[in-house]
Amino acid sequence: MEPSAEIPLGKGKETGRSPLIATRRKTGLVKAKIKTNSSFSMFRRADTMRTHAQFTNITVGWKSLCPITAEGQVNVAIYHESTRVPVLNLWSPVSSSWKHLATGSLGFVSLNHCPYVVEGRISGFEGEEAGLVTLTLHLDTGLESDDIQKCRLFSEHPELAGGSLYLYTSYTSSPIPDSNLPALRTEIDDTIAAIWRMSGGKMSITTSHALGLIATFRVKIESLLGEYPDDAFSAQVENLVKDFLLVSSTAEITRSYRTCLAKVLSSMTTYDKKYWDTIITGPSSI
């Protein structure tokens, strides 16, 4: 087998079982049905570690099947079973398609079971088909498909076991949902005000940075920091805010969310252009 091969993680009418390494005629589509604000897993994590067989890199991608106005976000994380730190941890709007390549000497812990956990999460929607996750291993020379046994796809939700494997979301068929913009603007302004208040006026962030925090973490800043009295904003908490800003400024979702938002705005005729253009074109890094 050539050093580049794809993993088919369920295809067609297969019911949760497929070989880890695909033939040339197969694609590397991952499909799983989940509910709103829920999560799914596609590989089971093993409890033991064995000898490694190496490959050089891994590519994960998301092909959106939704229109640009789709609400909600998708998170795909890939864990090697030797660590709890993800090899990849990607966030994006459901409506944005992407591919990401991770390089390095990644390894199979054993040749007779799946060494990776692929975990996903979608939030903010439910209903119609969302898209397809693809996963590709670029193998070292000498590793044959027959060396690796089958992996079992599974969901952590028992009611979904054995069902058709599709990742579900929802989208609106109505006109551009401009009514969502006031709510997003309120959340942006509230985030800025909360950090200003909790710092006693010592720390402020831009609207662009606030959007990054909202898009990345999907919770209010008070929930990230915990409840602190107005006079108890410490250097430690200030450092936490800076850490959150660093994460959001480098996250895939920050870039793709801006792109998605810009496309939505370009389809609208009436909106506060000055306010939103500042956010779209504002600094994404700290």
Swiss-Prot record:
Keywords, ordered alphabetically = Host-virus interaction, RNA-binding, Transport, Viral movement protein
Superkingdom to which the source organism belongs: Viruses
Q: Which GO terms describe its biological process?
A: transport of virus in host, cell to cell
Q: Which GO terms describe its molecular function?
A: RNA binding
Q: Does the keyword RNA-binding apply?
A: yes
The family annotation for this protein states:
Belongs to the nucleorhabdovirus type-1 movement protein family.
What this chain does, per the entry, is described as: Transports viral genome to neighboring plant cells directly through plasmosdesmata, without any budding. The movement protein allows efficient cell to cell propagation, by bypassing the host cell wall barrier.
Q: What is this protein called?
A: Putative movement protein 3
Which species expresses this protein natively? Maize mosaic virus (isolate Maize/United States/Reed/2005)
